[in-house]
Amino acid sequence: MYLYSLTLQQATGIVCAINGNFSGGKTQEIAVARGKILDLLRPDENGKIQTIHSVEVFGAIRSLAQFRLTGAQKDYIVVGSDSGRIVILEYNKEKNVFDKVHQETFGKSGCRRIVPGQYVAVDPKGRAVMIGACEKQKLVYVLNRDTTARLTISSPLEAHKSHTICYSLCGVDCGFDNPIFAAIELDYSEADQDPTGQAASEAQKHLTFYELDLGLNHVSRKWSNPVDNGANMLVTVPGGADGPSGVLVCAENFVIYMNQGHPDVRAVIPRRTDLPAERGVLVVSAAVHKQKTMFFFLIQTEYGDVFKVTLDHNGDHVSELKVKYFDTIPVASSICVLKLGFLFSASEFGNHGLYQFQAIGEEPDVESSSSNLMETEEGFQPVFFQPRRLKNLVRIDQVESLMPLMDMKVLNIFEEETPQIFSLCGRGPRSSLRILRPGLAITEMAVSQLPGQPSAVWTVKKNVSDEFDAYIVVSFTNATLVLSIGEQVEEVNDSGFLDTTPSLAVSLIGDDSLMQVHPNGIRHIREDGRINEWRTPGKRSIVKVGYNRLQVVIALSGGELIYFEADMTGQLMEVEKHEMSGDVACLDIAPVPEGRKRSRFLAVGSYDNTVRILSLDPDDCLQILSVQSVSSAPESLLFLEVQASIGGDDGADHPANLFLNSGLQNGVLFRTVVDMVTGQLSDSRSRFLGLKPPKLFSISVRGRSAMLCLSSRPWLGYIHRGHFHLTPLSYETLEFAAPFSSDQCAEGVVSVAGDALRIFMIDRLGETFNETVVPLRYTPRKFVLHPKRKLLVIIESDQGAFTAEEREAARKECFEAGGVGENGNGNADQMENGADDEDKEDPLSDEQYGYPKAESEKWVSCIRVLDPKTATTTCLLELQDNEAAYSVCTVNFHDKEYGTLLAVGTVKGMQFWPKKNLVAGFIHIYRFVEDGKSLELLHKTQVEGVPLALCQFQGRLLAGIGPVLRLYDLGKKRLLRKCENKLFPNTIISIQTYRDRIYVGDIQESFHYCKYRRDENQLYIFADDCVPRWLTASHHVDFDTMAGADKFGNVYFVRLPQDLSEEIEEDPTGGKIKWEQGKLNGAPNKVDEIVQFHVGDVVTCLQKASMIPGGSESIMYGTVMGSIGALHAFTSRDDVDFFSHLEMHMRQEYPPLCGRDHMAYRSAYFPVKDVIDGDLCEQFPTLPMDLQRKIADELDRTPAEILKKLEDARNKII
């Protein structure tokens, strides 16, 4: 079995982010690392975040830093990764790629303790970079320029110190003196030698300055000073002419200014009034904003509070350090302050935010200062504050993030054409159920009812130079309605259009004339109001029409074509007639090329299943140039001019290709390339769009031509980042559409469906899925589907939080203390997770501020029944008494009295530290009442461990409780034990069943295949895995095969050999006698590993599903970082050979950007086996054209054929 691995949605979580001028000029961009992906983002003029470039590096990005050489105009990016190499990247604006400027090897690959890459720090003047490991090793590279002004890099200079842990690293701004780097370090050499543990408890962190002597080319430890043992982060303080130099040390509860030869200046970080005394305050991210006359720091704590830190200094001497409350935003892994007045927050969990500065915190607020620091017997006097609504910042955009994706199921609850992906995401108050649909999201601008069922709609401008459309023209079966576009859309009668007949086409002709084609003729309306009519000869009528701005072709009944052109005066002149062999099914004329008077090509679709290209040149007018046979009669034709598939912003610098798109009556879109010179057709591709014949329309998206295909659902064909995408729109079925442009909606679409006129616009391009968000209360853990009622049951739990009632009581208390009424200036009983907007009236929205923190051993949990069709919670049971839900399943017991029941595994008083401990475990049994919309507790059964896995099995309940697999039956007051097996190695975390087989996943020992013998009432293991895997997800594939994922980012399949499987099924004891003997301290039989692949991210859920109507199934997976991928089985040996060779050539010709070897990356823990990396193969279109041809020649193909194979492989999955 060979599989094709493809990422459907890239990771959405962000590990780290930096900002700078990477493209040169004044524009500021943000470079973000999403695990194995490097993205370049830029806020547009509307304050929306746009992705400029995205690249898969096939390695783990651990750290990023930017630097600029003195006098240069753009920034470079230094990447610390798991490749054992330092890589310096430069963004190439013309080609829209990252160019690798330097790559220097210094150590082994992989994320290791002593191999640098975890920390990267640069000298603020761009003269040197230090790359550090968690322990021991630090290397310094000197950066310079050669005679041609290109960046050069020196050999590495070592700054190693053994037995030393590094916590943070940063450059020190010392102007143009020798570069200095600062590190927080801890020497553990004594602690290592002392068995009593006293030296470990006395170990002291130090702040160490490393100086690079540019004259001697040598690094030395210049200064080391003890620092607070809670120190975790360093921030560079501007130096030279801009400030006092030195560093800010962020420690638990404190911010300390430190510099060589300067006394420490310390201020406490203000803490929330409701924070338990046992909890400290740690800084998790920081940013500095520097202007010519001043600078300040923004630091964010682990609770999301942002503080403004300022230094009062005179020259190099700092007299006071102030920490003032600024605002509260969700906790971020990185924050970036842009010069345009934006703050980008890369959230740890949930959506990322772009904020605009309203003010910079000059108004009085809660402030702590080094000058009023008070020391008491318990320590320093804390300063308290109460979070408030945003005052200095306002959120203007957010980027969706699924991180962390906790559970995922592919279901078609809404009975749509394609299934939906239901995913549990987020953490705490930012948790959500997200319903993902393949396709682009749209924003509906207006819907209005029409007096009847319209058949078509067009928009027209009055003049070619107009920016916006003037009229919407709607055709009915016996009339035409004209609406003018202004402040209001209203009907007009003086437009010159004939309104007593249906219309076949409405368009602008020439520079300022309008044309209406109706069954009996052509109406030409001049700018001055004069109207010219052309009537059809005899009793024949016009059936089809094709047109552009200067040319019109009509097809009369019987198959006669008549060709018109607009002359110099704007008058329509008949040029040529041509008799076709039969009726014409559809027509289209190619757009007029820039600077030309006419287009050369006319496409004609006939009912004999052919499409012909005819010439419109005066020399050979209406002569057939080429013929294409298609699988069904064409319904609609569209010429689309698109740019080449590589290049700068959307390939703008490359010559256009002309594509002919045909919508066929069997629901297929047929796409073929038209030779711009000869009109010959080549490189055809087809894709099934839906059950209705696709109608094709040309619209404008981001200023470029795009194609709207209306089948049983709408599709959009468009260019994004140099590639052509054909993606469904998440909208209802439409009948007819036209581009729409007004001052309120510059790039919209007007469409008709049923008796309604709809205007909408397309949101973000390039997305695979769009999402509907349903907020949840606590961190979701797992969910199940009620099979008959189509309701979802979700279990949620959080550690160290208060229940909803306790939070409500505390909130009221807080309002009363603040002198506000019970509802504050909003509503205290506002929806449970504070809605999605900071603008809501609630001054303490949980979504923004997080939940108040409780003691770490306190748990809150709830069971939610949710109707996904209405997104409403029909039942919410909050668990009491410190219980947390861990597992859930639906179960039908032999006793049919209650029907489908719900089993929930919970644990009371769970503690992980200092050692794992719990009071008791329970299995709750609930019955569904009120049509499944509510739950009623039948009983709960106490068990001795944590029930992490539950599963129905032959009318009973299987439970994994610690290392015990137990079978329960339903009793009146509790569950009744029927049978158990205690021989599992550690902890059971998953159970799946098929017939009489049970597939058990152990937390650290992979899969165990079990059987239940009903006659002996015994559970026994007949096969297990010989590789100890730390399971995070599992799925049953077939009778002998299981798919699993481990916590190191691998996906693997194991299969019981066919002969063993048959032997066990035929054996009257079912392998039981062999089991009693055992083998290698385990089961008598071992499963074979048949598939192995390193995804590079921890997979949390696996499922077998098909995303395409009637398509074959794939294994879908979701990861912690929020990416969604699929593994699809090849059906032919030819495909395996082709993609294997393509992958081999891509490895050779396109080495990963950050220096990791692709083969080694995909085999990071176990050698890759029988999986082809589709993500690498899909980099093929980004290669230069000569390289594409070289690879294609070696594969005996053309580049177009390879692109077609890649497109087909993706279309089989989604």
From Swiss-Prot:
Disruption phenotype: The double mutant sap130a sap130b displays a slight reduction in the size of aerial organs and in the number of lateral roots, and is impaired in reproduction due to a reduced production of viable pollen and impaired female reproductive organs. Defect in the transition from microspore to the bicellular stage in pollen development. Reduced expression of QRT1 and QRT3. InterPro entries: Beta-prop_RSE1/DDB1/CPSF1_1st (IPR018846), Cleavage/polyA-sp_fac_asu_C (IPR004871), Quino_amine_DH_bsu (IPR011044), RSE1/DDB1/CFT1/CPSF1 (IPR050358), WD40/YVTN_repeat-like_dom_sf (IPR015943), WD40_repeat_dom_sf (IPR036322). It comes from the Eukaryota. Keywords: Nucleus. Residues 817-848 are annotated as: Disordered. Residues 834-845 have a biased composition (Acidic residues). It holds the Pfam family Beta-prop_RSE1_2nd. Subunit of the splicing factor SF3B required for 'A' complex assembly formed by the stable binding of U2 snRNP to the branchpoint sequence (BPS) in pre-mRNA. Sequence independent binding of SF3A/SF3B complex upstream of the branch site is essential, it may anchor U2 snRNP to the pre-mRNA. May also be involved in the assembly of the 'E' complex. Also belongs to the minor U12-dependent spliceosome, which is involved in the splicing of rare class of nuclear pre-mRNA intron. Belongs to the RSE1 family. This is Spliceosome-associated protein 130 A.
